[in-house]
Amino acid sequence: MTSRPALRRYAVIGNPITHSRSPQIHAMFAAQTGISLEYERIPAPLDGFRATAEAFFLAGGQGLNVTVPFKQEAFELAREHLSARARMAGAVNTLTWRDGVLQGCNTDGVGLVNDLIRLGVMLQGARLLLVGAGGAARGVLQPLAEAGCAEIRIVNRSPGRAAELLAAWTASGIPGGVQTSAGALDEAGGAWDIVINATASSLHDLAPALPGGLYAPGALAYDMVYGARPTPFMRQARADGAALTADGLGMLVGQAAESFFIWHGLRPDPTAVLTTLRANLLAED
């Protein structure tokens, strides 16, 4: 009698974690690609990320998705073997145990760029306004620039934080040809092709205090937060003249697809997964 090979073990780790849709997403990716795997949610104490993650890998785990509030701690855990994107982001959302080495990557920016492409947005030559200067904003700057944006302006409620983020990005090496600037929310300017809300304002049923006149003809407003209904930022953008609005559900699926590729070497199709998740959100509303 032959024994079956052990299932490859993966998980998402965070606090809180019960809301995470990652197990469902990776199960659908696995079904698409014919891969057998086990994927679970792992809650970690706020002061116990390292111990929990190390125990998972010592028990044979092969990959972890990392969510709030542990992305910076994951960066430190994998500091010796970080991808260029993770170094720029200062955060890791994908940990991989491979050949006796713990590797760290950040797939958030790739997930965002791929979702913008799915939406039909022209990134080459685009003028982009990024609202927010926290970890979510930092994680997407480099991929957006590499995708061809001509101008990126960072604005934040605390303009000093926007300036600090721009300085850190400049020090790490901004791709040539990208015009950059930073300022306060009321210094956002106008005629932007893409406006991305990288703050958590919509989670609190609020929109950033942005001035009017932000949007160029045909512009997209994109909120990294997602839900069954349009977010406060999306509603604000529509009222201000944005031609298109989108939430961050596609970014969630896109970053998961990139993690799946890192782990398995196969690219799943996110479209069907996104359709299923959107239907689930509507049913839960």
Curated annotation (Swiss-Prot):
Disulfide bonds: none
Residues the record marks as active site: K71
Keywords (A to Z) from UniProt: Amino-acid biosynthesis, Aromatic amino acid biosynthesis, NADP, Oxidoreductase
Gene Ontology MF term list: NADP binding; shikimate 3-dehydrogenase (NADP+) activity
Pfam families: SDH_C (PF18317), Shikimate_DH (PF01488), Shikimate_dh_N (PF08501)
Biological process according to GO: amino acid biosynthetic process; aromatic amino acid family biosynthetic process; chorismate biosynthetic process; shikimate metabolic process
The protein's Enzyme Commission number: 1.1.1.25
Pathway this chain belongs to: Metabolic intermediate biosynthesis; chorismate biosynthesis; chorismate from D-erythrose 4-phosphate and phosphoenolpyruvate: step 4/7
Any single GO CC term annotated in Swiss-Prot or TrEMBL for this entry: cytosol
Residues binding NADP(+), per UniProt: G132, A133, G134, G135, A136, M224, G248
Binding site for shikimate: S20, R21, S22, T67, N93, D108, Y226
Reaction(s) catalysed (UniProt annotation): shikimate + NADP(+) = 3-dehydroshikimate + NADPH + H(+)
Keyword presence, Zinc-finger: no
Superkingdom of origin: Bacteria
Physiological role: Involved in the biosynthesis of the chorismate, which leads to the biosynthesis of aromatic amino acids. Catalyzes the reversible NADPH linked reduction of 3-dehydroshikimate (DHSA) to yield shikimate (SA).
Membership in a protein family: Belongs to the shikimate dehydrogenase family.
Subunit composition and interactions: Homodimer.
Protein name, UniProt field: Shikimate dehydrogenase (NADP(+))
Lineage start: Bacteria, Pseudomonadati, Pseudomonadota, Betaproteobacteria, Burkholderiales
